[in-house]
């Protein structure tokens, strides 16, 4: 059993956060999670959800220092007094960014890492690694270089490394953020299996639809406090308006319909012609031919590892192993030119945040930045209160919004977003969608790698489905295509 008793916590000024009251800080949390319960923690980005998980696994206060009042009890023992090695044997954590918890360069070693630290015999380690891969249906990922994995595949390995250790408590922070629909369905199945085994599960999540028949309780946080503790039945009875007023996303994707466009033919501005992409001389995508016009918002859809991010990197001149040409207005453009005219919001935005403050990041590397545009964009994405904060101190969703802000401010002609809604609540997703629509109206070409159907329906005018190394389908978002698009979006990832 996990118990929070009048728990308040504020990050130390020398720790991850800056001094002063922050929304990530917690105030007077009283919460009991019984053995075998699955509890969903949700709420606006930066409201303290991740901090709660850090208190359970002991990272607060052992790794993240701060002012701690009250108690967190794990089976009756104060977590702050339990040695970290002992807590780690009881509590398994999958972080929001799985890259931050990897210690090895190959997948088998990563899955085995926790078992090795607990001094299991070699034979047992090999058996547990094999069983974890089999149970989680990721045998195809064994023996792989971690750096070659997609974001979704990395999340699967992080989950497997925890599953192999068989903890009694699972802490999952945004576990679906980079997963395709098939993988989300698999995650759903894994969670049901863990529940049947009597495991205790705490899930931090914005994407709620796949958890509605799993979660026993839904805890909504707001500015570091528990706003409401719902039973599953109570939560499902909320209206869309009530849910959205708390910054929460849809519970039923079937209600979402794609944006309908006019479908008018426009002049081709960008054209990949007979393009093939390789990774370490192995073909990823072959013979890609397509035509794109200014103002289009194109969704790149398909299973984890199919090559969506590789195609995005090639579009903006960041991928080396390539055959074929890219044409702009009918003329071949070089890799260097593509780099100049494009900007990419990466799947892991930590790779592209360089400045010492949020405000400085918004104009970092941009010649003659428009001060008014910087201020307007920061305000639109609710980044103004954090203007003097270091980007590294932001929550995952806040970092995502910051990277999107730079995408608007840089005034590039070609903008690529790789999973831009990872870690975003409903309101933040709507704000990013508004930015995307505005950029489209300005004549930019936008490509969005996404598994987020809710976001897709608010932004995209066209969908490219990648499968088996090629463009499997290319559909405009027209009225007559609505149902086909919905089915394709899900079936492209294996879910009906």
Which residues are covered by each model-predicted region?
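The feature captures the beta-strand-to-loop junction immediately N-terminal to the Walker
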Residues: 42-44, 301-303
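Helix-to-loop junction immediately C-terminal to a conserved catalytic motif
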Residues: 57, 316
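Conserved ABC ATPase signature
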Residues: 145-149, 153, 390-394, 398
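Catalytic Walker B motif of ABC-type/P-loop ATPase nucleotide-binding domains
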Residues: 170-173, 415-418
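H-loop/switch region of ABC-family ATPase nucleotide-binding domains
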Residues: 205-206, 450-451
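Conserved ABC ATPase "signature" region
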Residues: 123-141, 371-386
